[in-house]
């Protein structure tokens, strides 16, 4: 009976394809593009049929073909039926592939084409989007800045708006605090860079066709020294893919394992399929590559410092924030925003979701203190007391406050005695008993510039009230003072302060109301860091859930060579580098030294650059220019959407499309991985079907399709796509692997484009983070970390430290401090190695440059490209026909230099020079200049004083030095510069 069913299916296949082609243009076009013979047969020869595809038609022929272009062989009828089922069970299919119950031979391009055709026959009739009265169609999509409705008419985007929830969506949560009830507005809030996406899609800087550098010849002179100078000529996709695939094979044959390096940005376009932790890792693992590894560049001080006192290494040393929104609104008297400006950073991916909650706190009479070198946007919105502080000296103020707590008995003695170790040694240091220097408010004033009376007042108010500490953009972590030479000291001081006050007790916790809303976190949907379709269980968070719940083929990188991305220039230029890389699974892993080249591996000779730009995000980025032009780097390919600063150093450019031009699926703000439950930032938990709103512009393609095209030329396309799965097929597989089918059908989800997850009952919502520790209970928050082996007591009992308690003197650092005196077990105050306290440096460069995370763009995303973000005067200023990056300078410092509002100025030091437009303001501390990091523009011009960048790439000036000998963190905020009026007329690029 089952054999008869299989015969019937194979017999009917041509008719089904022809009917689908007649009805759907996408199937018709796909059918027209294929010219091949595909054969399906049983391994024992009992059944065989082949299909001839030619000139847009298909014919089925019984029996075997002598030379089929592609052949699929099945071990049994059951396997064959599973493989041809229009509603496949991928657990059965993947089992068949892994255990060779089914196999494919022949031309990879034919196998992939046939698989995609069969998938398209099944999906072409799926409906999505909502037709509007004005004739447009409304689609949904998700960005790094929040979810959008995208309106399209005649194949062109006409507008984008934040998603507004309606009565059919789940109810909002309600918090009751101090006699009032609070519920969030029923609309999504999004960041400026999200609303700029339409302008970015149609940017004149879009890369629409494959390009080759004019003086690059893969068969002859490569002229590596001309990268960044020479222009480009348009080539066909066939030419581009042939060159790239050929270079991959040449690298392997001529140089061996490790010759190909793949580099990606910290972030990319949103989505579980096209994100770099997904499709890129799958691609890279299949070809084998030297991993240019990311590091916690927004969390440096927490990872290299704070976690040694209490653990949480799998969160980069940052706490979890569960339940803190309600606890703060109910219990807290004071919020101290220390280097925390959530109104600029939007948390991470969450738009302005936290703004309303912070305004509730203001309505309730909760007081605010802001400690920052500038009167930042959060301080301006909320009001409160501003304590301007010299950059890099924050630890001195923190120590003085803790000194006052001790001498005035303003700390939680019982908590410290029962739940911590090492306090006696720490107390003696603060009181000066061990080094003869009491850390008094007067002592810190000389370092920080904060008046002793203000430090004393802060200590008194904080120590006598229930206080939330907001240390960084998320409330702990994400930018701020942790990104400096003293960043680890500062982050360590932050957790030490909380331990002294009774961390986890009602009203005493980390947070700035950016995270910790009431939410049902038992509902599962994967975040992007869970690896998407990568199949990589060692370098992503795939193993616990994603790999188990969504059957797919495992991939693994056979090359064991790694280079941290900030060390890539040294690796290429010098041929070697060493240091300490990020390890998200083990606290002690950060003490393991890496060496490049790794034994038995080749040096890097090819760089595959994927998206965005390092020049705007990595300190002392001028090093990358020299690396790109080094003769040992024989080939550079850049897969990018726009002609940004790093794309111009490529030999071959592959044009990728935006997230509005391809399919994907994801959840708002759910990155998972080391920001587990990051969706706890948003007011309404929402999963988004990222509709393909328009066709890709020009000849651009999705990242997934580009990888598939390259791998198909290498005979790996069928493996990469698991038999020809399209992005839409993968979306359906991810949907099925989640808890979404319990709430909504695939048909309805695809049509509407989003599904809100109800906040659930109180029992389904997480308890307050660290409350369990304060009350002496086992851990009860819903995070699968730390690992069982990291406990020194019973599983879930105590902290993952050597003692099981909070350690004022970190035992993990004590075991290693002889190797690195700048990272001692006792968190002693050490001045910055580059700062205004160093007179030799400060004479030439008396101003300290702070480059914060940008308010309007997302790193380089949305900057430049003539996007609407560039029209914002706080982001770029139009002077003489060119939009210049903005640098903020104190009124007094500007007057001394003859600088007026919006004058062009040269910001410079020994590392380089950048032309910016001045914003003269009283909101920046004297001696400090402030700007955003992450300019996407890099535009060197010739001047009598040498080369100067007018694009705004201030990371040319920041130091490439690591935080300390064994802490490979970056320290861009430890940067001295001088600022002078740029007297020359606006100039054109050289």
Per-region residue spans from a language model:
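Flexible, glycine/charged-enriched surface loops at secondary-structure junctions
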Residues: 255-259, 412-416, 469, 505-512, ...
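N-terminal export/assembly segments and adjacent metallocofactor-ligating motifs
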Residues: 126-410, 451, 494, 534-550, ...
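Long, contiguous, secondary-structure-rich segments that constitute the structural scaffold
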Residues: 182-189, 687-760, 839, 844, ...
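N-terminal leader/propeptide and maturation segments of large enzyme subunits in energy/redox metabolism
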Residues: 195-202, 206-239, 271, 408-456, ...
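Feature captures hydrophobic
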Residues: 1-130
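Extended redox/cofactor-interaction regions of prokaryotic respiratory oxidoreductases
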Residues: 276-360, 364-366, 370-371, 396, ...
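Flexible glycine/proline-rich, aromatic-decorated loop/lid segments
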Residues: 374-377, 645, 650-688
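Short acidic, glycine/serine/threonine-rich loops at helix termini
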Residues: 161-163, 272-277, 346-350, 379-384, ...
């Amino acid at each position: 009976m089952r054999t008869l069913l299989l015969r019937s299916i194979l017999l009917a296949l041509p008719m089904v394809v022809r009917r689908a082609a007649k009805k759907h243009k996408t199937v018709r076009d796909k059918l027209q593009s294929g010219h091949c013979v595909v054969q399906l047969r049983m391994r024992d020869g009992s059944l065989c049929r082949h299909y001839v595809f030619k000139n847009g038609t298909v014919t089925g022929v019984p029996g075997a073909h002598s030379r089929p272009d592609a052949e699929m062989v099945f071990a049994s009828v059951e396997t064959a039926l599973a493989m041809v089922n229009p509603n496949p069970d991928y657990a059965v299919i993947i089992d068949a592939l892994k255990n060779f119950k089914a196999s494919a031979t022949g031309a990879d391009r034919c196998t992939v084409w046939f698989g995609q055709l069969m998938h398209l026959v099944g999906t072409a009739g799926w409906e999505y989007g909502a037709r509007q009265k004005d004739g447009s169609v409304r689609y949904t999509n998700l960005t790094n800045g929040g979810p959008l409705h995208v309106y399209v008419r005649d194949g062109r985007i006409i507008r984008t708006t934040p998603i507004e929830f309606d009565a059919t969506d789940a109810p909002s949560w309600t918090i009751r605090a101090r006699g009032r009830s609070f519920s969030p507005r029923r609309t999504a809030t999004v960041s400026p860079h999200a609303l700029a996406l339409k302008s970015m899609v149609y940017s004149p800087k879009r890369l629409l066709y494959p390009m080759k550098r004019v003086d690059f010849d893969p068969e002859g002179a490569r002229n590596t020294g001309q990268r960044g100078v020479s222009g480009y000529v348009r080539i066909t996709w066939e030419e581009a893919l042939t060159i790239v695939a050929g270079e991959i094979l040449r690298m392997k044959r001529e140089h061996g394992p490790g010759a190909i390096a793949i580099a990606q940005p910290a972030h990319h376009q949103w989505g579980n399929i096209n994100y770099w932790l997904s499709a890129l890792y799958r691609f890279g693992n299949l070809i084998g590559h030297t991993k240019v590894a990311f590091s916690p560049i927004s969390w440096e001080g927490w990872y290299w410092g704070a976690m040694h006192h209490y653990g949480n290494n799998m969160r980069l040393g940052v706490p979890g924030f569960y339940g803190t929104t309600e606890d703060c609104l109910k219990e807290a008297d004071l919020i101290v925003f220390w280097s925390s400006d959530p109104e600029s950073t939007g948390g991470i991916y969450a738009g302005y979701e936290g703004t309303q909650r912070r305004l509730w706190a203001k309505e309730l009479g909760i007081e605010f203190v802001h400690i920052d070198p500038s009167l930042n946007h959060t301080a301006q919105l909320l009001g409160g007391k501003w304590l301007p502080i010299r950059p890099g000296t924050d630890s001195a103020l923190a120590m003085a406050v803790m000194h006052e707590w001790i001498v005035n008995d303003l700390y939680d003695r019982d908590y410290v005695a029962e739940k911590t170790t090492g306090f006696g040694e720490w107390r003696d240091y603060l009181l000066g008993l061990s080094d003869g220097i009491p850390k008094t408010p007067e002592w810190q004033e000389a370092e920080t510039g904060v008046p002793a009376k203000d430090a004393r007042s802060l200590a008194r108010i904080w120590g006598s009230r229930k206080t939330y500490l907001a240390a960084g953009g998320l409330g702990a972590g994400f930018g701020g003072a942790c990104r400096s030479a003293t960043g680890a000291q500062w982050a360590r001081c932050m957790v030490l302060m909380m331990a002294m006050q009774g961390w986890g007790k009602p009203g005493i916790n980390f947070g700035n109301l950016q995270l910790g809303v009431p939410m049902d976190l038992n509902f599962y949907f994967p975040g992007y860091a869970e690896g998407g379709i990568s199949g990589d269980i060692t370098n992503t968070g795939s193993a616990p859930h994603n790999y188990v719940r969504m059957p797919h083929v495992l991939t693994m990188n056979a090359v064991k060579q790694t280079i941290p991305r900030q060390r890539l220039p040294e690796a290429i230029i010098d041929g070697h580098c060493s240091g300490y890389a990020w390890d998200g699974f083990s606290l002690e892993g950060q003490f393991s030294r890496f060496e490049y080249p790794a034994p038995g591996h080749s040096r890097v000779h090819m760089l595959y650059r994927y998206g965005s730009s390092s020049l705007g995000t990595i300190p002392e980025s001028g090093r990358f220019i020299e690396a790109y032009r080094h003769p040992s780097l024989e080939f550079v390919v850049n897969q990018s959407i726009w002609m940004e600063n790093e794309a111009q150093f490529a030999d071959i450019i592959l044009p990728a499309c935006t997230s509005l031009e391809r399919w994907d699926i994801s959840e708002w703000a759910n990155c998972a991985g080391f920001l587990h439950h990051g969706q706890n930032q948003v007011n309404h938990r929402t999963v988004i079907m990222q509709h393909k709103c328009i066709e890709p512009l020009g000849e651009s393609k999705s990242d997934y399709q580009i990888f598939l095209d390259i791998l198909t030329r290498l005979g790996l396309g069928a493996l990469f796509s698991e038999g020809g799965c399209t992005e839409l097929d993968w979306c359906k597989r991810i949907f099925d692997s989640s808890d979404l089918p319990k709430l909504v059908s695939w048909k309805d989800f695809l049509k509407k484009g989003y599904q809100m997850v109800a906040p659930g009952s109180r029992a389904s919502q997480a308890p307050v983070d660290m409350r369990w520790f304060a009350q002496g209970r086992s851990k009860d928050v819903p995070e699968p970390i730390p690992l069982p082996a990291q406990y020194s007591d019973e599983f879930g009992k105590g902290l993952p430290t050597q003692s099981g308690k909070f350690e004022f003197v970190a035992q993990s650092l004590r075991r290693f401090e002889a190797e690195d005196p700048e990272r001692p077990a006792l968190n002693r105050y050490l001045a910055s190695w580059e700062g205004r306290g160093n007179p030799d440096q400060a004479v030439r460069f008396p101003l300290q440059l702070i480059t914060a995370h940008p308010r309007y763009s997302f790193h380089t995303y949305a900057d430049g490209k003539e996007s609407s973000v560039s029209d914002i005067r706080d982001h770029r200023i139009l002077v003489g026909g060119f939009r210049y990056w903005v640098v903020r300078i104190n009124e007094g410092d500007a007057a001394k230099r003859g600088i007026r509002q919006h004058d062009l100025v040269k910001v410079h030091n020994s590392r380089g020079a950048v032309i910016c437009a001045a914003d003269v303001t009283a909101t920046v501390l004297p001696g400090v200049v402030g700007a955003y990091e992450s300019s996407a523009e890099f535009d060197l011009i010739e001047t009598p004083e040498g080369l100067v960048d007018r694009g705004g790439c201030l990371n040319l000036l920041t130091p490439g030095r690591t935080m300390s000998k064994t802490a490979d963190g970056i320290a861009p905020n430890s940067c001295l510069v001088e600022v002078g009026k740029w007297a020359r007329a606006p100039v054109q690029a050289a």
